[in-house]
């Protein structure tokens, strides 16, 4: 039982509010003290009142995030870990849980925040392309609906496993790919912001395990 009866408290939960954690499993994530992941949606979804009796919630004064700096040696890296996570933390503090909407936050307010940060030159974490995730998938054909995290960003991709560069093909919003029988394609994509800032690389391995028909 959380001892909130005697003193006011600020909540900082390890699973949801330790901002030194990595956001994804991508190989190009910075080194972190923790091996667990903290995506933005998990931060936004945290409810400080959960598990606390209604009569005790008046002792909860606010929410707090921690940033452990054993592997964070520059102000720029600290800014990268904090932005845009700090906006999700703010909404935890001032929005009743029944009024929170991840979709509204991620599709309306977050893009506006990201555009302002990018224009300011402040270091921040640029989200990877929306509509595709790291992993593996099997089949003959695959379809994706891809969105950049905010207007003005480009999504570049490769199909040979190489890290996408500025000169690689731009991924359209509706993206279809067919994989020949018995073959595999390594789809990699990255967001590139107007400032030139890049997201981590998303890698999806697509495999068609159907065998080719051998002529008799």
Residue ranges and their predicted role:
Residues 100, 106-216:
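Short, compositionally stereotyped local motifs that mark structural "simplifiers"
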Residues 1-8, 13:
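Single conserved hydrophobic/aromatic residue that forms the stacking wall/gate
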């Amino acid at each position: 039982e959380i001892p909130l009866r005697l003193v006011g408290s600020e909540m900082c939960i390890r699973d949801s509010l330790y901002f030194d954690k990595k956001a994804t499993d991508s190989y190009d994530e910075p080194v972190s003290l923790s091996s667990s992941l903290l995506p933005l949606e998990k931060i936004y979804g945290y409810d400080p009142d959960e598990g606390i009796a209604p009569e005790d919630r008046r002792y909860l004064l606010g929410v707090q995030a921690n940033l452990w700096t054993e592997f964070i040696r520059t102000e720029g890296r600290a800014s990268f870990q904090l932005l845009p996570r700090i906006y999700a933390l703010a909404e935890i503090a001032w929005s009743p849980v029944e009024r929170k909407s991840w979709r509204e936050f991620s599709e309306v307010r977050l893009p506006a925040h990201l555009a302002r940060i990018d224009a300011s030159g402040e270091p921040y974490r640029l989200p990877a392309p929306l509509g595709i995730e790291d992993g593996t998938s099997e089949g003959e054909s695959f379809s994706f609906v891809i969105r950049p995290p905010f207007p003005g960003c480009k999504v570049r991709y490769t199909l040979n496993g190489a890290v996408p560069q500025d000169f690689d093909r731009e991924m359209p919003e509706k993206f279809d790919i067919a994989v020949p029988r018995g073959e595999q394609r390594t789809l990699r994509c990255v967001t590139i912001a107007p400032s030139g800032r890049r997201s981590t690389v998303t890698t999806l391995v697509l495999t068609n395990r159907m065998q080719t028909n051998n002529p008799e």
